[in-house]
Amino acid sequence: MYKFSAIEIRDQFIRGDVSASAITQHYLNRIAKYDQKIGAFLSVYEEQAMMQAKQLDQKRLANQPLGKLAGIPIAIKDNILVKGEISTCGSKFLTNFKSPYQASVIEYLLAEGAVIIGKTNMDEFAMGSSTENSALQKTSNPWNLKCTPGGSSGGSAAAVAGRLSPLSLGSDTGGSVRLPASFCGVVGFKPTYGRVSRFGLVAYGSSLDQIGPLATNTADTALLMEVIGRHCPKDSTSIALGPEDYLSQFKDSIAGMKIGVPWEFLENLADEPKKIFQQSVNLMKQLGAEIVDIDLSILKYSLAVYYILATAEASTNLARFDGIRYGQRSPKAKTLEEVYDFSKEEGFGAEVKRRILLGTYVLSAGYQDAYYKKAQKVRTLILRSYKEAFAKCDLIASPVSPFAAFEIGAIKDPLQMYLEDIYTIGINLAGLPAVSIPNGFSKDGKPMGLQLIGAQKHDREVLNAAHILEKSLAFHPAIPELVKEETSA
């Protein structure tokens, strides 16, 4: 079962070849067997998932309509709210926080017959690139347990890579879906800003955050986008576009397409990732695409711009976690001021505190003009550079990360960790759609990813091109040795 795609699983269920209960139990068994080593899940909804599955079985037997995701288990990043369930955001601060309402994307998933199987680990409040900043547990990469799965959606990527769930949802503020997808050898898609509702997503950087799907292949990713990509009246930033057909509209060729490559921005890329990326570029040429050199040199400022704007938004968003309205209240506090101070001191981890301090600093009266407002101006220039690039090409190609997955604990310097996002953050600053697809392995057997970037609202074109390349790469979704079984029962 675990070797099948999500679409194949759904079709088998609809035909009556297998019950939703059997599908769900299969993945629950795999979680019980393998997740002790991987650590992808913070909570597993065993009873609730089986109840949902049995209801789907009854609907099928009664010949009632079944949704696009009928019978497919899905894992959810723990900053996306599921009503009545604990949502920790990977933080001690929210260890016992039960969501009083449902995220819009969860409503859409349930309406289409998906089975919510559990919540996945993440960097605390989505602040990190390795999932090492989770205050609750360690998550390992299924390809190499000594390595990180990437972050901040590391649990969601590890769950899919380990075949503990056919699909998962993550969130992407600066690369947090694409980077773990690259490290774990799966597909991760960051939609156009506003294409997927953020209602019920715990905010980190409100102008940057976007919920995105992870799967073993692009067709499953596109299927999930057909369900979650729609206008939501509860989200003021939601684009006024209805659901879109992806799979039925996919073309079968990229011949004649212009693919832009920002070679100047990639000049410091190490030899091995550069070689793997070059092989993908050569493949695009063989498939009839024209490779165009584009200028995105302004992206050398993207890291500074991102960490000014994202931290400024984070300091504002996390102000609500004060021990009174949300979160754990410090038992040491004797006054209202102490409740605020002690609760945050005890509840937040080091990286969250670092980013709140930086954000508060750049928003302070003496420095707002020098940092925050200047960063906003450069963000506008970055958006303009992308628009100029897309006047010359249809899509842009780049690596996802400067390197493959690194060992847990190997990067101590926060600035070095921030550089991991150098090829992904510009996309969030410009609100563009981008996908990471597996395009090879390093010499020591770690997956690496190719990033395809589209203009705003060209989500389908990005996934279409990724689908064509995926087939041409002959990269049949590889399965880590750790989680392979002799039978698919």
Swiss-Prot record:
Record-level Gene Ontology MF annotations: ATP binding; glutaminyl-tRNA synthase (glutamine-hydrolyzing) activity
Top EC class, one word: ligase
Catalytic activity: L-glutamyl-tRNA(Gln) + L-glutamine + ATP + H2O = L-glutaminyl-tRNA(Gln) + L-glutamate + ADP + phosphate + H(+)
Residues of the active site: K77, S152, S176
Keyword set, alphabetical order: ATP-binding, Ligase, Nucleotide-binding, Protein biosynthesis
GO BP terms: translation
Domain of life, source organism: Bacteria
E.C. no: 6.3.5.7
GO cellular component terms, A-Z: glutamyl-tRNA(Gln) amidotransferase complex
Keyword Ligase among UniProt keywords: yes
InterPro entries assigned: Amidase, Amidase_CS, Amidase_dom, AS_sf, GatA
Coiled coil stretches, renumbered: none
Claim: Protein biosynthesis is one of the keywords in the record: yes
Record NCBIfam families: gatA
Subunit structure: Heterotrimer of A, B and C subunits.
The family this protein is said to belong to: Belongs to the amidase family. GatA subfamily.
Job of this protein: Allows the formation of correctly charged Gln-tRNA(Gln) through the transamidation of misacylated Glu-tRNA(Gln) in organisms which lack glutaminyl-tRNA synthetase. The reaction takes place in the presence of glutamine and ATP through an activated gamma-phospho-Glu-tRNA(Gln).
Protein name per UniProt: Glutamyl-tRNA(Gln) amidotransferase subunit A
Source species: Protochlamydia amoebophila (strain UWE25)
Gene: gatA
